[in-house]
């Protein structure tokens, strides 16, 4: 009989957490074995399905990650940077595949994942969808093909609850554009324009963040030159695309050598 991997969902009460719970329980390729929330949360001890307003799933929400991870083969984590760092160490201890969709992580926090990646598989991406990861590759190719006569701007829009800006996906796109041009994003990123800023610096990559309503996620990469413009665009209308990508990553990571991977590896792009 084929072994069916057990999955733990962190931040189970959140919008993404609930979508992940539904996606895992709807799949015949994995099984839900754990649902985590922070200590003191009113879901602790309740069946996660009932807490979500549905049928019982036989999995009680817990605030003990090590106990939950001990039963699992993978952890899917869309939480916050500090929480993700703690989960990474515990997931590595349990030898679980750790799928990280958490955004807003600093370079130092990303580097802090490396000790865990020496012992377990980490798959981390600012966006888990196939479409966005294709957009990243296209952005890199277009940036490499065009010279600095084409200004590059990354514009993203999300719901009004999102706490970080630019989005992780916008930064992925900016990194791809910078890589295509053979420069470091930190050297050319322009994240703040307000007031009398002067003319645009040639070669900069600009970022713009829109927050409003219930926008799931929209990303545009604009290449603008005198007389012509190219726009690469991705629109997500349902969080399920991120959940499906995360589940694909969790399955892909089974049996892989320890290391720090991304969705390009998972999708073979």
Swiss-Prot record:
One Gene Ontology term, aspect cellular component: cytosol
Name recorded for this polypeptide: 4-hydroxy-tetrahydrodipicolinate reductase
Gene Ontology process terms (BP): diaminopimelate biosynthetic process; lysine biosynthetic process via diaminopimelate
Originating gene: dapB
Reactions catalysed, as given in the entry: (S)-2,3,4,5-tetrahydrodipicolinate + NAD(+) + H2O = (2S,4S)-4-hydroxy-2,3,4,5-tetrahydrodipicolinate + NADH + H(+); (S)-2,3,4,5-tetrahydrodipicolinate + NADP(+) + H2O = (2S,4S)-4-hydroxy-2,3,4,5-tetrahydrodipicolinate + NADPH + H(+)
Binding site for NAD(+): 11-16, 37, 101-103, 125-128
Primary localization class, coarse: cytoplasm
InterPro entries documented for this protein: DapB_C, DapB_N, DapB_N_CS, DHDPR_bac, NAD(P)-bd_dom_sf
Family the UniProt entry places it in: Belongs to the DapB family.
Catalytic residues (positions): 158 (proton donor/acceptor), 162 (proton donor)
Gene source species: Ruegeria pomeroyi (strain ATCC 700808 / DSM 15171 / DSS-3)
Cell compartment(s), UniProt: Cytoplasm
Pathway: Amino-acid biosynthesis; L-lysine biosynthesis via DAP pathway; (S)-tetrahydrodipicolinate from L-aspartate: step 4/4
Source organism superkingdom: Bacteria
Entry function: Catalyzes the conversion of 4-hydroxy-tetrahydrodipicolinate (HTPA) to tetrahydrodipicolinate.
GO molecular function term, any single one: NADP binding
Entry EC number(s): 1.17.1.8
Swiss-Prot/TrEMBL keywords: Amino-acid biosynthesis, Cytoplasm, Diaminopimelate biosynthesis, Lysine biosynthesis, NAD, NADP, Oxidoreductase
Residues bound to (S)-2,3,4,5-tetrahydrodipicolinate: 159, 168-169
Amino-acid positions noted as binding NADP(+) in the UniProt annotation, renumbered to this chain: 38
